[in-house]
Design a protein with these regions (language model features):
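Short, glycine-/small- and polar/acidic-enriched structural segments
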Residues: 48-188, 194-197, 213-219, 234-237
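Secondary-structure end/capping motifs
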Residues: 264-339
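Pocket-lining segment of extracytoplasmic ligand-binding domains
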Residues: 118-120, 202-295
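A bilobed periplasmic-binding-protein/Venus flytrap-type ligand-binding module shared by bacterial periplasmic
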Residues: 75-77, 143-154, 251-270, 321
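Bacterial signal peptide processing site
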Residues: 23-25
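Bacterial N-terminal signal peptides that target proteins for export
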Residues: 1-9
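Conserved C-terminal helix/tail region of periplasmic/extracytoplasmic solute-binding proteins
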Residues: 330-355
């Protein structure tokens, strides 16, 4: 009997203890959902899947043409060397367009993105059946009419009548632009003037010696001739300004940025990042001329910083992308086609040329 009473007492004490423990546990504070959110909201190196994840950089093989076409990319190249870009650029500074064409075409292309002459861009599009497209426009006209010997006889296009003009770019943008501007100002390029072609080095030498009284050169060659002549060569006409007075409905655009279509389809984020970094580079060059001139010369895009310093404002650097590209340059392509269908690869491009 005593054993039964003892057992009952032990059972009662056990139940009472269990109830007390449960009550105590229920009254203890627990970690609230808001506490855990606050804790997990601390900055971390790895964003959560729900947060806005930044685009990761990708490898891009970039080619830049030396001269005015490459000036706008100088800051991007400098940032790339300093590992300050999002994309990882393996870049090449090419001496002429033929190197770029070879690197963008064929079964084993060497470049993904390149800056090229605007007429080369449309030729690439036609040649590759859409395998290369324009993703941005980067430089307006860079051609200037120069006069040597301390003369000041040319102040308008009409003043070129009867003169011999030494020029660069036979069968390319410069020739077509010169002939068009002359024609639209009432001068027959084949009768009213004499046009002789040579490379930039030879034209510059003829200006310096006075053998050429009038010449057309692009920046920075035009800039270099003016600086080196110490006042004997002057800028008479800016062909971009002369083009604008004609109200063609399009801009005189000398540089196009192109990319292989296959690369764009496989790496759209890399293209988007490049466009942002390229636009930033152009803005930097335009607004920080002295510093940019050092970069441009350092990459060998121009012969020296003083030349780059004067050339940058003359390059009409710009950035046009997206839906604005077609209206900006299509009229220019139409003019090239009328001058020589071969200048645009035999046919005018459709809207598929623009990215």
């Amino acid at each position: 009997m005593k054993h039964k009473k003892l057992l009952a007492m032990l059972l009662a004490l056990s139940m009472a203890f269990a109830l007390t423990a449960c009550k105590k546990s229920a009254e203890e504070p627990s970690v609230s959902p808001s506490d855990s959110v606050t804790e997990s909201a601390e900055p971390s190196e790895t964003p959560s899947a729900e947060s806005s994840t930044p685009v990761m950089g990708e490898d891009v093989r970039l080619a830049v043409l030396s001269g005015p076409t490459g000036i706008g990319a100088a800051k991007l190249l400098s940032d790339s060397d300093a590992d300050a870009t999002v994309n990882h650029y393996e870049y090449t500074i090419a001496a002429d367009n033929s190197e770029l064409v070879a690197g963008l075409t064929g079964s084993d292309p060497a470049f993904d993105i390149a800056t090229v002459a605007s007429n080369v861009a449309v030729n690439l599009y036609n040649k590759t059946d859409g395998g290369v497209k324009i993703i941005a426009l980067g430089t307006l006209g860079v051609l200037h009419i120069l006069e040597s010997g301390g003369n000041e006889t040319v102040s308008s296009v009409a003043d070129l009548a009867g003169k011999t003009i030494w020029a660069v770019g036979q069968g390319a943008n410069p020739e077509y632009i010169l002939r068009y501007v002359l024609s639209e100002n009432g001068l027959d390029p084949d009768k009213d003037v004499t046009i002789l072609f040579a490379d930039a080095t030879e034209v510059t030498q003829k200006l310096m010696t006075g053998e050429a009284e009038v010449a057309m050169l692009p920046v920075p060659a035009a800039t270099a001739a003016i600086i080196k002549s110490e006042g004997k060569v002057r800028a008479a006409l800016d062909m971009t300004e002369e083009w604008d007075t004609l109200n063609t409905g399009s801009q005189l655009i000398m540089t196009a940025v192109v990319a292989r279509t296959e690369f764009m389809e496989q790496h759209p984020d890399a293209v988007a990042v490049f466009l942002e970094e390229y636009a930033g580079s152009i803005d930097y060059v335009n607004t920080n001329v002295d510093d940019a001139a050092e970069l441009v010369a350092g990459f060998g895009i121009t012969p020296s910083a003083p030349i780059a310093r004067q050339a940058i404002p003359q390059c009409h650097l710009t950035y046009i992308a997206g839906k604005d590209m077609g209206p900006a340059i299509s009229g220019y392509y139409d003019i090239l086609w009328q001058a020589d269908p071969a200048a645009v690869g035999g046919s005018l491009p459709d809207d598929g040329i623009y990215y």
